[in-house]
Amino acid sequence: MRDPSSLYSGFPAGSQYESVEPPSLALLSSIDQEQLPVATGQSYNHSVQHWPQPWPPLSLYREGGTWSPDRGSMYGLSPGTHEGSCTHTHEGPKDSMAGDQTRSRKSKKKNYHRYNKPPYSYLAMIALVIQNSPEKRLKLSQILKEVSTLFPFFNGDYMGWKDSIRHNLSSSDCFKKILKDPGKPQAKGNFWTVDVSRIPLDAMKLQNTALTRGGSDYFVQDLAPYILHNYKYEHNAGAYGHQMPPSHARSLSLAEDSQQTNTGGKLNTSFMIDSLLHDLQEVDLPDASRNLENQRISPAVAMNNMWSSAPLLYTHSKPTRNARSPGLSTIHSTYSSSSSSISTISPVGFQKEQEKSGRQTQRVGHPIKRSREDDDCSTTSSDPDTGNYSPIEPPKKMPLLSLDLPTSYTKSVAPNVVAPPSVLPFFHFPRFTYYNYGPSPYMTPPYWGFPHPTNSGGDSPRGPQSPLDLDNMLRAMPPNKSVFDVLTSHPGDLVHPSFLSQCLGSSGSPYPSRQGLM
């Protein structure tokens, strides 16, 4: 083992640290301080000349340092380094590395202005650029270029949208690939077309995003007219710029609203009223849109006539003469409205037009909906909105057919009842001598009648006019099976009370008892 005294042979000759007795550990740990503690009882001079320490302090040894007595220094440190220099040597590179990482992290975060993402689906944007192309077909590179040109959001460093474009082209069945070379199906540079009939209507609508929820009015609500009718779509700068003057933004929103109003009538894929009327006009209603335009009245007049009846559709059985072209006779259908009954009043706007022109339009036809039978007297009543207008010939009422279903206001018996009113009452026991007292032709509890004596002596009940023939009655009018089953399975529920008192009252009667009927 090495002599500990040899460890201190590194002090220069004449040094105050040179001593026969080895210094204590406290002296070794604080050798670089200005005032050394009195370890050996000697007084040290305060003007200490600092010499380079040949080994690091012992505190590093306690912290896990690898100190070698042979080398007299720590591994990785020069022999002439002291505690302060050792600390700076280790912490200096760490601080420089942390600073470099912070600067690199700041350099990666680019401070650029990012445009708002368009609130449309990728399917709608792809179909839009393909339909706006002259040949209605584009390559993948052309689609990417047109989309980035039309929507500035895709001009930034974000490249994930290109994968979304490729995914929608390959997964959606509305896009079809046209091979540039049929012999090389796996080659690149093929064309893509779109089948507009397979595009979902919801995919062309404005999507629910944070931009649209914030009240942005710069984007059109529906791309269907631009995709289906090949309208030219031009991106709006106000949709992406954040520093737009309020006056310019207001003018752009007004222009877009007017554009939507003008294109709404030509759109036949939306459920707008103008679109539906346009479809009806193309079929067989040339005057439908004109009549509805005349019905658009002011709000004040609409409040006074808010309970006026809605127009009904009539199908004309005779050719009528068109008011615009007197020499041309066409067969068409028009709209008309009614006041109290089905068709005795026209709308206010249409009435004013007739009063100005002095013409009366003849409407002869049968309404699709059957009128009420008990509204005969209501046709003579006048409404304040009718004026002096009265049709030349009111529409004829449809006769009640036997195949029509009964309604709450039908004044005839439906054909599927058990017994029609033209025959005698249906009775379950034809051999019983039972006479009906009431005038009702039915044998159900709501129609049970009771005798009302007219004199003190009383009259005998009147008998049936003809014998009951159940077979012929059911052969002439087949009963409703469900009702017939109920009547035959529970006959006691529908037996007249007077029958029970007449025929089943006595105990010696040959007829079955009441318990047999129940």
Swiss-Prot record:
Q: Which GO terms describe its molecular function?
A: DNA-binding transcription activator activity, RNA polymerase II-specific; RNA polymerase II-specific DNA-binding transcription factor binding; sequence-specific DNA binding; SMAD binding; transcription cis-regulatory region binding
Show where the record puts the motif SMAD interaction motif (SIM).
Answer: 470-491
Quick one: where's region SMAD-interaction domain (SID)? 380-506
Q: What Gene Ontology biological process does one annotation of this record name?
A: left/right axis specification
Q: Where is the composition biased (Low complexity)?
A: 329-346
Question: Which residues fall under the DNA-binding region feature?
Answer: 117-213
* Feature: compositional bias, Basic residues: 104-113
GO cellular component, alphabetical, reads: activin responsive factor complex; nucleus
* Motif placement: Fast/FoxH1 motif 2 (FM2): 415-421
Keywords assigned: Activator, Developmental protein, DNA-binding, Gastrulation, Nucleus, Transcription, Transcription regulation
InterPro entries xrefs: Activin_resp_transcr_regulator, FH_FOXH1, Fork_head_dom, TF_fork_head_CS_2, WH-like_DNA-bd_sf, WH_DNA-bd_sf
Pfam families, per database record = Forkhead
| Location of this chain's protein in the cell | Nucleus
Q: Where is this motif: Fast/FoxH1 motif 1 (FM1)?
A: 405-409
Q: Where is this region: Disordered?
A: 72-113, 318-397
| Tissue specificity statement from the Swiss-Prot or TrEMBL entry | Highly expressed in the animal cap (prospective ectoderm) and prospective mesoderm of stage 10.25 embryos.
PANTHER family per record: FORKHEAD BOX PROTEIN H1
Free-text note on domains in this protein's UniProt record: The FM region is required for binding smad2/smad4 complexes. FM2 is more effective than FM1 and only interacts with phosphorylated smad2 that is in an activated smad complex.
| Physiological role | Transcriptional activator. Recognizes and binds to the DNA sequence 5'-TGT[GT][GT]ATT-3'. Upon TGF-beta induction, forms a transcriptionally active complex with smad2 and smad4 called activin-responsive factor 1 (ARF1), which binds a site on the mix-B/mix.2 promoter called the activin response element (ARE). Binds to activated smads and the ARE with much lower affinity than fast3. Necessary for the first steps in mesoderm specification, directly inducing mesodermal genes. Acts with fast3 to control the convergent extension movements of gastrulation.
Oligomeric state and partners?
A: ARF1 contains 2 smad2s, 1 smad4 and 1 foxh1/fast-1 protein. Interaction with smad4 is most likely indirect through interaction with the MH2 domain of smad2. Binds to the MH2 domain of smad3, which can incorporate into the ARF1 complex. The ARF1 and ARF2 complexes are activated by distinct TGF-beta family members; formation of ARF1 is promoted by activin. Interacts (via Fork-head domain) with gtf2ird1/wbscr11 (via repeats 4-5).
Q: What is this protein called?
A: Forkhead box protein H1
Instruction: Give the gene symbol.
Output: foxh1
